[in-house]
Swiss-Prot record:
Residues 46-67, 366-389 are annotated as: Disordered. Glycans are attached at N660. Residues 190-199 are annotated as: Interaction with ANK1. Residues 317-370 are annotated as: Dimerization arm. It is found in: Cell membrane; Basolateral cell membrane. Residues 1-422, 476-478, 526-537, 610-620, 703-718, 756-778, 819-856, 888-929 are cytoplasmic. A dimer in solution, but in its membrane environment, it exists primarily as a mixture of dimers and tetramers and spans the membrane asymmetrically. Component of the ankyrin-1 complex in the erythrocyte, composed of ANK1, RHCE, RHAG, SLC4A1, EPB42, GYPA, GYPB and AQP1. Interacts with STOM; this interaction positively regulates SLC4A1 activity. Interacts with GYPA; a GYPA monomer is bound at each end of the SLC4A1 dimer forming a heterotetramer. Three SLC4A1 dimers (Band 3-I, Band 3-II and Band 3-III) participates in the ankyrin-1 complex. Residues 857-887 dip into the membrane without crossing it. One of its GO terms (cellular component) is membrane. Disruption phenotype: Gypa is not incorporated in the erythrocyte membrane. Residues 69-303 are annotated as: Globular. The modification Phosphoserine is found at S18, S199, S222, S363. This is Band 3 anion transport protein. The gene is Slc4a1. It comes from Mus musculus (Mouse).
Length: 929
């Protein structure tokens, strides 16, 4: 046994203060909770560097720099295998962020947050204060570590010299894992006892402890940790081994804390990653001591980031004790009352976040906190004011457009090569159906609104041509262009205006297209895209709620019209079926109701099915993502099987023909088709052009903002000015050919981005997967547009779709658009007592009556918009909508405090990659479908 006085002679106090090192590390490593700003993080308190003779710190080594990576902690407990009558160390639990415990049947339980008893924390603090610490031990084998540790135990009077041999043999016993045991029915916690006195060895004599180490391990089955731990341990992790055992010949519990000089694979140990720390907890059996819980507390302590960093840099016992006290200060204790509900436990989350926030607040002695402002938790190049901000104005004519081109086009070659991935092909198939379903639905409804002057044929061709050009030239090719609800509302309003003023609707659209091109050139020239920053959630939610109401209203309006055209009668005269009946037809109204309701309910069910527990996750997601086309297909089959009842079908021309060839052709003469277009209207068309531009600007720019969120970790950037020029410019040219203008559709674009996001493996059991990369390329959008264009050849199939089925999809889009709209949630709260209100910021931080006042103002704005939409002045709807922006910016700050507006109007939508808790893309975007 080495003389511990030799260790005492080499002790010296390091020149560098560990407090400074620890502060630097804490400041540089981003805290996992992204809701806590970097500038609000606090370092631990100043740590003393006084040495004690019981701390072993070799002077020849510098304090190792802590790793910011993951840590794997394994708890092994001394057990007796009653079947083989042998003692062995059994892996009882492990931690990779979350805790996994080994059940009695030998199967690993689900990952969960560690919950500790209050006693175990107090007892841990007690044994830590009297423990033995070896910091910076240069050993590469378990036998060497055990010898050093036992020598220190004897030197500090933790154990008697005659106990050394017994404990050494115990520490070097065979290790077993879950797959070695099958189940734990015959494995029980063991207690080391002396059967024949203090001098009689507990274990049989072995010729050499080092050479006979783990002599029976090869017979115990496969080596290594449990399969669960191995598969999910992040690379470059560091292992902490915690050993817990009971020994009745010991007089008191003893703790040994060992930090190796370098994390290395210990000889004689089969662990997945190099070992950096080793904790040994041994003691006599006592009624008030549960060594399993004590080991769990120690293992949980080693998984905590700040304590682990402190342990990596500590020079003495006091530094570790200070860090342990800080750990206890941030631990919550539940009193022994009745078990609270899950909802009540949710209130602990903000309390814990506040404790962590205070723990990481910068100390007064630290440098200016603004030094941390440039840190970007998402791996970007800086904050919103950085030079690469696409919305930053240059002050030059077309400066933003030129900067977009210079930023994005150098990646053009990689936009092609990055598409060489099976995930891109899968995304093409998925997005094709996601784009085709609304194109057919809106095309059919557009034909209804415009007497087939524009319909399915024009919309499919417009979507294909504009989509191909945008995929080739756009700055953000992940945007999906398409027709949307707001544009449908405008088309209906403009068609009614032209009808009432005896104007040719399709010619008026051509002049609107001409003015659209001029308007977008002016806006892009003066970098007007920066205005999107002033459009808050307040305006977005009013806009989305209005469109949802219009969708729902139009669905039932169309259904009522069917009941009026084909009323229910008590008796029917015999009828002969014709292609289009002239009078009432049996069951047409009821069957249309069944088709509409069936399509809606089926689509809603399949959407929720994605988050159910049936079938494997991938199959559920496929069924949920293709819910709309599956619903349409099923209801079309139902309609086909019931041949005796007439239903109105979708009107689709054969081939590349316009929907109404008797009224128009493919090229629109700007002076008029059948009569001269008024000169005054040629110039007055600038007003409706401005309104269309507002709609396209709102949808496209907000969609680009959502898709380009830093959380998505896209590296090639976006181009607000270039994309706006392309979308509006192509829409203006399309009007000359009698085709609809399009915008970037929010839900479809977010779905496209999610489909191309490659998620890495989870950092640990139960942890969320992190983004590995996003396939930012042009080929998927290009192929989707080509397939949509080829769908015009599916006329025999499309013409079999009943309009009632499209009404069901229309209703589905209206209802799903309400998801994620805070305004809708607050309207529901008007009818709930305050005690049933959810625990969310806009409820907790804002008084109830003031929250209802804010909701009431939004409802008034919504009512004004609905009145405008229902009058002949409906064409001015976008202009009235844009007035809500100055209302929010200028008037509401006079009524509400800044904190209240942040809670009620803040952008708290989270990026959704894996659908959990019933959330999907609709919950992420407060924009209409």
């Amino acid at each position: 046994m080495g003389d511990m006085r030799d260790h005492e002679e080499v002790l010296e106090i390091p020149d560098r203060d560990s407090e400074e090192e620890l502060e630097n590390i804490i400041g540089q490593i981003a805290y996992r909770d992204l809701t806590i700003p970097v500038t609000e993080m606090q370092d631990p308190e100043a740590l003393p560097t006084e040495q004690t003779a019981t701390d072993y710190v070799p002077s020849s080594t510098s304090t190792p720099h802590p790793s910011s990576g993951q840590v794997y902690v394994e708890l092994q407990e001394l057990m007796m295998d009653q079947r083989n009558q042998e003692l062995q160390w059994v892996e009882a639990a492990h931690w990779i962020g979350l805790e996994e415990n080994l059940r009695e049947d030998g199967v690993w339980g689900r990952p969960h947050l560690s919950y500790l008893t209050f006693w175990s924390l107090l007892e841990l603090q007690k044994v830590f204060s009297k423990g033995t610490f070896l910091l910076g031990l240069a050993e590469t084998s378990l036998a060497g570590v055990a010898n050093h540790l036992l020598d220190c135990f004897i030197y500090e009077d933790q154990i008697r010299p005659q106990d050394r041999e017994e404990l050494l043999r115990a520490l070097l016993l065979k290790r077993s894992h879950a797959e070695d045991l099958g189940n734990l029915e015959g494995v029980k916690p063991a207690v080391l006892t002396r059967s024949g006195g203090a001098s009689e060895p507990l274990l049989p004599h072995q010729p050499s402890l080092e050479t006979q180490l783990y002599c029976g391990q090869a017979e115990g089955g496969s080596e290594g940790p449990s399969t669960s731990g191995t598969l999910k341990i992040p690379p470059d992790s560091e292992t902490t081994l915690v050993l817990v055992g009971r020994a009745n010949f010991l007089e008191k519990p003893v703790l040994g804390f060992v930090r190796l000089k370098e994390a290395v694979p210990l000889e004689d140990l089969v662990l997945p990653e190099p070992v950096g720390f080793l904790l040994v907890l041994l003691g006599p059996e006592a009624p008030h001591v549960d060594y399993t819980q004590l080991g769990r507390a120690a293992a949980t302590l080693m998984t905590e980031r700040v304590f682990r960093i402190t342990a990596s840099m500590a020079h003495n016992r006091e530094e570790l004790l200070r860090s342990l006290e800080s750990f206890l200060d941030c631990s919550l204790v539940l009193p022994p009352t009745d078990a609270p509900s899950e909802k009540a436990l949710l209130n602990l989350v903000p309390v814990q976040k506040e404790l962590l926030r205070r723990r990481y607040l910068p100390s007064p002695a630290k440098p200016d906190p603004n030094l941390y402002n440039t840190l970007d938790l998402n791996g970007g190049k800086g904050g919103p004011g950085d030079e690469d901000d696409p919305l930053r104005r240059t002050g030059r004519i077309f400066g933003g457009l030129i900067r977009d081109i210079r930023r994005r086009y150098p990646y053009y070659l990689s936009d092609i090569t990055d598409a060489l991935s099976p995930q891109v092909l899968a995304a093409v198939i998925f997005i094709y159906f996601a784009a085709l379903s609304p194109a057919v639905t809106f095309g059919g409804l557009l034909g209804e609104k415009t007497r087939n002057l524009m319909g399915v044929s024009e919309l499919l061709i417009s979507t294909a041509v504009q989509g191909i050009l945008f995929a080739l030239l756009g700055a953000q090719p992940l945007l999906v262009l398409g027709f949307s609800g707001p544009l449908l509302v405008f088309e209906e309003a403009f068609f009614s205006f032209c009808e009432s003023n005896n104007l040719e609707y399709i010619v008026g659209r051509a002049w609107i297209g001409f003015w659209l091109i001029l308007l977008v050139m002016l806006v892009v020239a003066f970098e007007g895209s920066f205005l999107v920053q002033y459009i808050s959630r307040y305006t977005q939610e009013i806009f989305s709620f209005l469109i949802s109401l219009i969708f729902i209203y139009e669905t039932f309006s169309k259904l009522i019209k069917i009941f009026q055209d084909y009323p229910l009668q008590q008796t029917y005269a015999p009828v002969v079926m014709k292609p289009k009946p002239q009078g009432p037809v049996p069951n047409t109204a009821l069957f249309s109701l069944v088709l509409m309701a069936g399509t809606f309910l089926l689509a809603m069910t399949l959407r929720k099915f994605k988050n159910s527990t049936y079938f494997p996750g991938k199959l559920r997601r496929v069924i949920g993502d293709f819910g709309v086309p599956i619903s349409i297909l099923i209801m079309v089959l139902v309609d086909s099987f019931i041949k005796g009842t007439y239903t109105q079908k979708l009107s689709v021309p054969d081939g590349l023909k316009v929907s109404n060839s008797s009224a128009r052709g493919w090229v629109i003469h700007p002076l008029g088709l059948y009569r001269l277009f008024p000169t005054w209207m040629m110039f007055a068309s600038v007003l409706p052009a401005l309104l269309v531009f507002i709609l396209i600007f709102l949808e496209s720019q907000i969609t680009t903002l959502i898709v380009s969120k830093p959380e998505r970790k896209m590296i090639k950037g976006s181009g607000f000015h270039l994309d706006l020029l392309l979308v509006v410019g192509m829409g203006g040219v399309a009007a000359l050919f009698g085709m609809p203008w399009l915008s970037a559709t929010t839900v479809r674009s977010v779905t496209h981005a999610n489909a191309l996001t490659v998620m890495g493996k989870a950092s640990g059991p139960g942890a969320a997967a992190q983004i590995q990369e996003v396939k930012e390329q042009r080929i998927s959008g290009l192929l989707v547009s080509v397939l949509v264009g080829l769908s015009i050849l599916m006329e025999p199939i499309l013409s079999r779709i009943p309009l009632a089925v499209l009404f069901g999809i229309f209703l589905y889009m209206g209802v799903t658009s309400l998801s994620g709209i805070q305004l809708f949630d607050r309207i529901l709260l008007l009818f709930k007592p305050p005690k049933y209100h959810p625990d969310v910021p806009f409820v907790k931080r804002v008084k109830t009556w003031r929250m209802h006042l804010f909701t009431g103002i939004q409802i008034i704005c919504l009512a004004v918009l609905w009145v405008v939409k229902s009058t002949p002045a409906s064409l001015a709807l976008p202009f009235v909508l844009i007035l809500t922006v100055p209302l929010r910016r200028l008037i509401l700050p006079l009524i509400f405090r800044e904190l209240e507006l942040q809670c009620l109007d803040g952008d708290d939508a989270k990026v959704t990659f894996d659908e959990e808790n019933g959330l999907d893309e609709y919950d992420e975007v407060p924009m209409p479908v």
